[in-house]
């Protein structure tokens, strides 16, 4: 989860140090044995095998991607305090691919003045569709309501009912596999970094990792740069067949990502596991405490 796509840095250089001969002042080790002459030393060097210096290992395909992700996360943590957007998403949960969800989202990122948290993470979601959950609202403010979600039911019946829910409960995970506590752009990149680190550990030689970059992509009319990672073969520790992320070239935030599982057979299309698209993104909208007040759930 760009200003420019980074290229892999130069690989480490290995230097082979040889030993030379001194040709003057060399004493015979035994009586009657002459010191080697310059000519004999040169001949000895010429007879040595011509062993080339070992080639440095090639960098892992994900090395520059990780570096890039760290730099982007640092940039967002320094410059983005809050944002609003609309999310269009669907996920495969318990084997079934959801219908598209359309969600308006208000997010206040966590900020620090070391070591104190000056602004806790806060999230408000309002579901626009599909109809069975239209009008649902979900509120989370770290440190309030015992760190539980406040949820207005929405939908066709008893839409006004508000309950509090554990964000790690199974009922929440049946709706979304992305924790609401990790929904901010910085947290999306943090989750991406952890996944990349796991990929490197599972494929340390990088022979099962293909990285593609598209610098001229467009998402909803906005110029983007896209990164796609593919693992052709299923392997322990790898979580996906392919995953893509698009970064808005002007805003430097991820505006789309999708993940695919491995196909069951080579002639099948890989099954979609999840996709998220962010539109109408406004950064630093100066969201205040009233935006994340519980009273928002009781309104129309």
Label each PLM-derived region with a short phrase.
Residues 1-10:
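Bacterial N-terminal signal peptides that target proteins for export
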Residues 9-20:
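Bacterial N-terminal signal peptides
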Residues 42, 64, 68-71, 75, ...:
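Exposed alpha-helical structural elements
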Residues 60-159:
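N-terminal mature ectodomain segment of secretory-pathway/periplasmic proteins
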Residues 23-59:
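Compositionally biased, proline/threonine/alanine/serine-rich low-complexity intrinsically disordered stretches
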Residues 6, 36, 40, 55-65, ...:
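Intrinsic-disorder-associated interaction segments
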Residues 92-94, 128-132, 139-141, 145-300:
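Gly/Pro-enriched, hydrophobic low-complexity segments
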């Amino acid at each position: 989860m760009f200003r420019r796509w980074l290229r892999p840095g130069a690989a480490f250089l290995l230097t082979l140090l040889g030993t030379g001969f001194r040709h003057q002042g060399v004493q015979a080790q035994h009586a009657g044995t002459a010191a080697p002459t310059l000519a004999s030393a040169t001949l000895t060097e010429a007879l040595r095998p011509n062993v080339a210096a070992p080639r440095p290992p090639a960098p892992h395909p994900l090395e520059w991607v990780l570096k890039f992700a760290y730099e982007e996360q640092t940039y967002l943590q320094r410059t983005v305090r809050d944002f609003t957007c609309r999310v269009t998403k669907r996920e495969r949960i318990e084997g079934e691919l959801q219908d598209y969800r359309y969600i308006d989202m208000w997010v206040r990122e966590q900020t620090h003045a070391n070591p104190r948290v000056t602004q806790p993470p806060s999230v408000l979601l309002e579901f626009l569709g599909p109809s069975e959950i239209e009008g649902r609202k979900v509120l989370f403010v770290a440190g309030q309501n015992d760190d539980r979600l406040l949820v207005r039911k929405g939908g066709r019946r008893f839409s006004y009912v508000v309950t509090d829910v554990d964000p790690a409960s199974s009922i929440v995970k049946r709706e979304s596999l992305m924790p609401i506590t990790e929904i901010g752009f910085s947290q999306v990149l943090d989750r991406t970094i952890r996944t990349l680190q796991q990929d490197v550990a599972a494929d340390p030689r990088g022979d099962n990792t293909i990285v593609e970059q598209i610098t001229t992509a467009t998402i909803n009319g906005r110029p983007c740069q896209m990164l796609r990672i593919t693992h052709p073969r299923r392997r322990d520790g790898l979580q996906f067949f392919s995953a893509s992320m698009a970064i808005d070239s002007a805003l430097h935030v991820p505006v789309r990502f999708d993940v695919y599982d491995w196909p069951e057979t080579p002639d099948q299309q890989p099954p979609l596991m999840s996709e998220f698209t962010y539109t109408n993104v406004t950064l630093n909208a100066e969201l205040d405490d009233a935006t994340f007040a519980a009273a928002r759930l009781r309104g129309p």
